[in-house]
């Protein structure tokens, strides 16, 4: 947080006044992890303060934002445990967003898909659940839906598509993804997402040792240096 409570409220009001359909509070990045892959770039952000006004985000912060935005749907992003999901529901958030910040915050943390079932159980239908985590293929997205997620976020995939082909690239990416989803659902024998359930997903041993680019099987030499 780069300001005090008044700064938080002013920023939230600006978002509401600008017509945003929902407000998201990211709760897992009050401290940044060791991002060693970025060190060689010598990237520096000008006009951005190097220190934050307040590092601690508490459930009082959640209530502060909720009281400020009123009826606008409120999402808490960065939930990774059933315990935090249950507390979020008690605070009447509209959506729990499962995310480990791309796995860049803390080594050896659980993968998002690993925590999904216990969070679904803790939420028990009382709010919506979004999950992210480098999803790029329809099969993996449908696994998350089958395990109880209401939506799968694909920000990184869309950013790659925009970088590759601007708006046309993004449209093409979404069209290909739609085709892949339809084909996968057809092969599963379902006609709507609400027909999916955990029985469609089972454990499997990895076919190779995992690494930071395991999800991208078509990379030259198996990874980007």
Across the structure, where does each feature detected by a protein language model lie?
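Alpha/beta enzyme core
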Residues: 2-131, 138-160
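Alpha/beta catalytic cores of nucleotide-metabolism and tRNA/nucleoside-modifying enzymes
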Residues: 113-225
């Amino acid at each position: 947080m780069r300001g005090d409570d008044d700064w938080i409220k002013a920023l939230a009001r600006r978002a509401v006044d600008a017509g945003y359909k929902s407000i998201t509070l990211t709760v897992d990045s009050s401290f940044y992890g060791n991002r060693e892959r970025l060190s060689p770039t010598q990237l520096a952000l000008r006009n951005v303060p190097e220190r934050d006004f307040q590092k601690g985000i508490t459930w009082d912060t959640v209530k502060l934002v909720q009281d400020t935005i009123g009826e606008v749907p409120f999402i808490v992003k960065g939930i990774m445990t059933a315990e935090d999901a249950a507390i979020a529901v008690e605070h009447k958030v509209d959506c729990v967003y499962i995310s480990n910040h791309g796995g860049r915050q803390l080594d050896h943390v659980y993968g998002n898909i690993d925590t999904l079932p216990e969070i679904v159980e803790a939420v028990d239908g009382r709010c919506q659940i979004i999950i992210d985590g480098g999803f790029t293929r329809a099969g993996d997205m449908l696994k998350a839906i089958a395990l109880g997620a209401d939506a799968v976020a694909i920000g990184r995939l869309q950013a790659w598509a925009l970088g590759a082909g601007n708006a046309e690239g993004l449209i093409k990416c979404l069209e290909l993804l739609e085709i892949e989803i339809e084909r996968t659902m057809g092969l599963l024998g379902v006609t709507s997402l609400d027909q999916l359930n955990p029985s469609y997903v089972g454990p499997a041993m990895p076919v190779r040792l995992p690494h930071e680019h395991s999800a991208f099987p078509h990379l030259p030499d198996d990874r980007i240096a």
